[in-house]
A protein has these predicted regions:
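Compositionally biased, low-complexity intrinsically disordered regions
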Residues: 2, 9-14
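ATP-dependent adenylation/nucleotidyltransferase module used to activate substrates
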Residues: 17-199
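Charge-dense, low-complexity polyampholytic segments
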Residues: 141, 210-217, 235-243
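Short Fe-S-cluster ligation motifs
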Residues: 224-260
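Local cysteine-cluster metal-coordination motifs and their immediate loop/turn environment
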Residues: 207-228
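A polyampholytic, Gly/Pro-enriched intrinsically disordered region
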Residues: 104, 201, 228-231
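Short, charged low-complexity linear segments at domain edges
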Residues: 184-210, 248-255
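Serine/threonine-rich, low-complexity intrinsically disordered segments
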Residues: 4-7, 23
């Protein structure tokens, strides 16, 4: 179910509004090329009307993910735009994903992973996507934020999603009806893998590794999360890793720290 805002200026644009569901919903998907967003694109294509994939080049060290977003768009015969915000990315220093620091290795829920936070990344991308949606009269913008992101990334949490949607209702009041679709918000990565398997997503055609090498490294937080998710979901992982077994020890150490 996707909610919609009311068109027309109002004293309270945050009030209750009509519901639009199913194939009638014209949806733009933010797609990085990763497992979560590619699965979301397939889900939207199967259940709604996928109007466009929007990706962002913000000088991320793993920008090879954008090629996987392009492949997804081709597979789903959807228009695909890569928005160049490299000038913005240059200003967002301090993150291991945009600056010269090393990408941390280990479990994705460790405190050390906080260096992968890019300040305000989702808010910036979503603001652009909502503008695109308004311009082309789409009904919704969909993003693949999920439960596994909540610990590290503040702009993936339920409170952010609710606040951002409220802000957009005010920003577009009297202009457009755009809702914020986040079907994975309270799901685990393993849940998303199961959903992707149901939708027959070609998982080998997705990219997660933050290091951006020739293969998934198998050691960074996103590689560990990806490998563990397939294991917990009971789904074969087609991904070739440079270190395919590191995740086991990383998960064991994380559990031990939680119990200590």
């Amino acid at each position: 179910m996707i909610r919609r805002t009311l068109v027309g200026a109002s004293a309270d644009p945050v009030a209750a509004y009509p519901v639009k569901t199913g194939a009638l919903v014209k949806t733009i998907v933010l797609c990085s090329g990763g497992l979560d967003s590619v699965t979301l694109a397939h889900k939207v294509a199967a259940e709604s009307t996928l109007t466009r994939l929007v990706s962002f080049d913000y000088r991320q060290r793993h920008n090879k993910e954008l090629e996987y977003a392009r492949r997804c768009a081709t597979r789903l015969t959807a228009p695909h735009d890569v928005v160049d915000i490299a000038a913005v990315g240059r200003l967002l220093t301090g993150s291991a994903l945009t600056s010269g620091g090393a990408v941390p290795e280990g479990h994705y829920a460790e405190e050390t992973m906080r260096v992968t936070v890019v300040p305000n990344r989702n808010a910036i991308m979503l603001a652009i996507a909502f503008g695109v949606a308004a311009a082309e009269r789409a009904d919704a913008v969909a993003a693949a934020v999920h439960g596994g992101d909540h610990f590290i990334y503040p702009d993936c949490r339920p409170a952010f999603v609710e606040a951002f949607e409220t802000m957009q209702r005010h920003a577009l009041d009297g202009v457009a009806r755009i809702s914020f679709s986040t079907p994975f918000l309270r799901m685990s990565k393993a849940d998303i893998v199961r959903e992707g398997a149901r939708l027959e997503v070609p998982f080998a055609e997705t990219w997660s590794c933050y290091k951006g090498g020739a293969l998934h490294c198998g050691r960074c937080g996103t590689c560990v999360e990806r490998r563990e998710a397939f294991h917990l979901a009971g789904v074969d992982d087609p991904t070739p890793y440079e270190d395919p077994d590191y995740w086991v020890e990383a998960c064991r150490k994380h559990r031990a720290r939680q119990l200590s």
